[in-house]
Every structure is written in C-alpha cells, then in structure tokens.
C-alpha cells in the first residue's frame, strides 16, 4: 500500500510574505536595517512531515550538528569546525570560545552556590515521570551571563507539553513551543524550525511518546534590508511537501545521538539562495 500523499504547507512562506508586505522599517544592532513586525506564530504538525523549508535548499548538516553541539553543553566553536560546520565562525573569539551560549545554559545553568543545573536532563526526567507538568521549560536567557556571550540567545525559551493518550494502547503526544525574541526570517528561522522539530522527535523517542506539534512564536520578526532580493526570489517559488525524518536507532540517552542516526528522506527543494549574515 502506498503511503498517503503529504500535504503542501506554506506557514513559513506566508510568514515571510506577511513581514515583507506589512513590516515597518526599523533600525537594528548591526546597522543593516530591517523590515519588521512584532509578534507572530506558526504551528507545524510533525506528523505531516519534517518542517524543513523547501523553497530553498537548507543545509541540514549544519542544523543537526549544531543541535548535537548544544546538547553537549560546549561553548567551543572548535567542536563545530572539526565537523565541517562554520555557522558560528563570525562570532567566535580567537581561541574559539563563544562564552556561556545556548548549550552551556541548557546543560550547566550556574546557581548562586557554585553548582549547576542541567535543564535538559531535568526535562527528560519530568517528561518520563510527570508528563502533565506545566513546568517543562528550558531557558537560555540567563540575564547574569548575557554580557559574557558572544551572541545573546535569539531562540531563548522553550516548553514541552504532553497530550495524554486518547485510547487504550496509544502513547502520549509531545509538542514543543519555542519563543524566539529575535528572528532573522531569511537566514535564521528555517534553521530554528528544523532544529527544534528535530529536538522534539528526539525527546519523544527517548520518552516513549509520539510527536505532536511544533509551535514557533517570534518577537521581533525581521527581514534584513540586504535580503530583500533573496526574499522576492524565494516568494516566487511554490513550496513542496515537507520531507520525512527517520531516526535510525534509539541510543541509551538523549546525549548519545550521532549525526548518522538521522535520515531525512524525500527532501524536494528549490536551489539554495545565498545571503550575507548580519553580525
């Protein structure tokens, strides 16, 4: 029996079109200039496919590798460069250190008594033991550490939610909502959507749950002025159905996944579109 056809979804393209059409001119830290709106939300049903943008080719290796790096708790760009990923190069210091960025806050949030909190391990434990909790949250926005970071967190806060089984023999469904305080729509947001969708799949596998929705919520949602031509090109393209994600093994813990454990199939996409990064 053939698998049912996957629907074509355009949440991301609709978002981009909305900001490009209705955004206001606004300055920014980089001096580039943006077109911006405040507040937007997208919802992706992870059972309909893996939400990897199709109107341009997205570099999946960088997304997977960066997420695995976050989960190590490392602050070193060397870890990424050793694996051929250069997306953090513009912010790395001479010694390769990035300060207490995402992974450090996820895995080693410092406490006043000199200890550390592993937020990710706490999430896994809570999903397994108290799935109805409304406190299954990870924050990267550590106010005391912001000035030490090479780049302050853009995707700053996320929460998990388990919908209970609806019938005997079913499993609960895991959803995730991200709050992204600063959203570079052309370059950054496609990475962020796919990264947190992947993390939701990994968490679900580790906690014996099905996947539900990924909800992306943005604060300052902007298109840089030097991305306008690229955005017009991308919006001229028709999206394809999302690909499917396959996790090829179940490791002993969330922290034992390897790059080769993930396979994205049937990724139909338009050609890549290059654009400068605002630093």
From Swiss-Prot:
Q: Which residues form the active site?
A: 154 (nucleophile)
Coiled-coil regions, chain positions: none
SUPFAM superfamilies given for it? Answer: Thymidylate synthase/dCMP hydroxymethylase
**Keyword Transferase in annotation:** yes
Biological process annotations from GO: dTMP biosynthetic process; dTTP biosynthetic process; methylation
Task: Report keywords, A-Z.
Answer: Cytoplasm, Methyltransferase, Nucleotide biosynthesis, Transferase
Asked if the Swiss-Prot or TrEMBL record annotates the protein with the keyword rRNA-binding, the reply is no
Q: What is its main location?
A: cytoplasm
MF terms from GO for this chain are: thymidylate synthase activity
- The signal sequence is none
Enzyme Commission designation: 2.1.1.45
Which Gene Ontology terms of cellular component type are present?
Answer: cytosol
Q: Which reaction does it catalyse?
A: dUMP + (6R)-5,10-methylene-5,6,7,8-tetrahydrofolate = 7,8-dihydrofolate + dTMP
What HAMAP family has UniProt attached to this entry? Thymidy_synth_bact
Subunit notes for this chain? Answer: Homodimer.
Instruction: Give a short account of what the protein does.
Output: Catalyzes the reductive methylation of 2'-deoxyuridine-5'-monophosphate (dUMP) to 2'-deoxythymidine-5'-monophosphate (dTMP) while utilizing 5,10-methylenetetrahydrofolate (mTHF) as the methyl donor and reductant in the reaction, yielding dihydrofolate (DHF) as a by-product. This enzymatic reaction provides an intracellular de novo source of dTMP, an essential precursor for DNA biosynthesis.
Q: Which family does it belong to?
A: Belongs to the thymidylate synthase family. Bacterial-type ThyA subfamily.
UniProt name for this protein: Thymidylate synthase
Q: Which organism is this protein's natural source?
A: Paracidovorax citrulli (strain AAC00-1)
